[in-house]
Swiss-Prot record:
UniProtKB keywords: Cytoplasm, RNA-binding, Transferase, tRNA processing, tRNA-binding
PANTHER family: ATPASES OF THE PP SUPERFAMILY-RELATED, CYTOPLASMIC TRNA 2-THIOLATION PROTEIN 1
Protein name, per record: Cytoplasmic tRNA 2-thiolation protein 1
Enzyme type, top EC level: transferase
EC number: 2.7.7.-
NCBIfam families xref list: TIGR00269 family protein
Pathway annotation from the record: tRNA modification; 5-methoxycarbonylmethyl-2-thiouridine-tRNA biosynthesis
Function: Plays a central role in 2-thiolation of mcm(5)S(2)U at tRNA wobble positions of tRNA(Lys), tRNA(Glu) and tRNA(Gln). Directly binds tRNAs and probably acts by catalyzing adenylation of tRNAs, an intermediate required for 2-thiolation. It is unclear whether it acts as a sulfurtransferase that transfers sulfur from thiocarboxylated URM1 onto the uridine of tRNAs at wobble position.
Organism: Aedes aegypti (Yellowfever mosquito)
Single annotated GO MF: tRNA binding
GO biological process: protein urmylation; tRNA thio-modification; tRNA wobble position uridine thiolation; tRNA wobble uridine modification
One Pfam family from the record: ATP_bind_3
Length: 341
């Protein structure tokens, strides 16, 4: 006897939801998945009518599903949003150039404006060039820092009201684990926030509508909806620290299926003593973008690359400051020698 959909629609069950364990038909799964994201948006007041929302589009499953679902919900519930696509070209041959073709396909399919910004035009460097200088170690540090700022720059250029990113529940849980393992209380405070930034006129908020959506269900939704997305992993990703947190999370999930939501809820409930130092977020005194240090991490990393010190800014801030001071001292000495002659 066939298993029927647990919603009582009388249709044959097609899948079992990893998140809830419910056996659902395809149509009821689509509706449940979309409704949960709608509830997340409404309960957390992520958007306001009339907002221009930039979807951070990489061509991967998360951003593709996010673009599709936001378009569906915007029309179904009359959010009154203008949706646009914002993509960052990191300059990774054989990866980002291919994925951007998928983003362009999404642009055409959904009728959304698309803006592509490259590291090369913003910073004068591509990730291929950076990796040729620093090797395969710490390359994700450069890419992550530059990408976050590139999204801010792109959002400002497009004059949007907020940026929607495709971070899913697995991503959030992994980040909580990473910050616990690194003892990074500053990032641990905000990694579970569904909305960040936007506290001053020059700061554009970011929102995570897929915060409670399981990665497995995002893949299932994209597959059964026949959405076009790019599924190749970044060629530089295998050495990323996040990979260890991801593997650990998968091991935990086999033992306790609810562990992803458990970790997220634990992260949301964490509180810190008043004596724990909390870095103040302001503007970088060089580039003017949001930062919790002076100068910002992007400016420090970029200065290191331009000075021929690619390791500058990788590691502790005090080490970076010492390296900058030493380099300045050498420059001053060189200028004095030139003056003597």
């Amino acid at each position: 006897m066939p298993i029927l959909c647990t919603t009582g629609c009388s249709r044959k069950a097609f899948l079992k939801r990893p998140k809830t364990g419910d056996t659902l038909c395809r149509e009821c799964f689509f509706l449940a998945f979309e409704t949960e994201i709608h509830n997340t948006i409404e309960q957390n007041k992520l958007f306001r009518r009339g907002d221009v929302v930039a979807i951070a589009a990489s061509g991967g499953k998360d951003s593709t599903v996010l673009a599709h679902v936001l378009k569906v919900l915007n029309e179904r519930y009359d959010y009154g949003l203008k949706l646009v696509l914002l993509s960052i070209d990191e300059g990774i041959t054989g990866y980002r150039d291919d994925s951007l073709e998928t983003v362009k396909r999404n642009r055409d399919d959904y009728g959304m404006e698309l803006k592509i910004l490259s590291y090369d035009e913003l910073y004068g460097w591509t990730m291929d060039k950076i990796v040729s200088k620093i090797g395969r170690s710490n390359n994700c540090t450069f890419c992550g820092v530059f990408r976050r700022q590139a999204l801010d720059r792109g959002a400002r250029l497009m004059e949007v009201d907020c940026v929607a990113t495709g971070h899913n529940a697995d991503d959030i849980a992994e980040t909580v684990l990473m910050n616990i393992l690194r003892g990074d209380t500053a990032r641990l405070r905000r990694c579970c926030d569904i909305k960040t930034g936007g506290k001053d006129a020059d700061s554009i908020p970011r929102v995570k509508p897929l915060k409670y959506a399981y990665e497995k269900e995002i893949v299932m939704y994209a597959h059964f909806k026949k959405l076009v997305y790019f599924s190749t992993e970044c060629v530089f990703a295998p050495n990323a620290y996040r990979g260890h947190a991801r593997a650990f999370l998968k091991d935990l999930e086999r033992i306790r299926p609810s562990v992803i939501m458990d970790i997220i809820h634990s992260g949301e409930q964490l509180s810190f003593k008043d004596t724990v130092k909390k870095p103040l977020r302001g503007k970088c005194n060089r580039c003017g973008f949001v930062s919790s240090q002076q100068p910002c991490k992007a400016c420090v990393l970029l200065e290191g690359l331009n000075r021929g010190l690619p390791k500058l800014g990788v590691g502790k801030k005090s080490k970076a400051n010492r390296m900058i001071a030493a380099q300045n001292s050498l420059r001053q000495s060189a200028n004095l020698v030139k003056t003597d002659f």
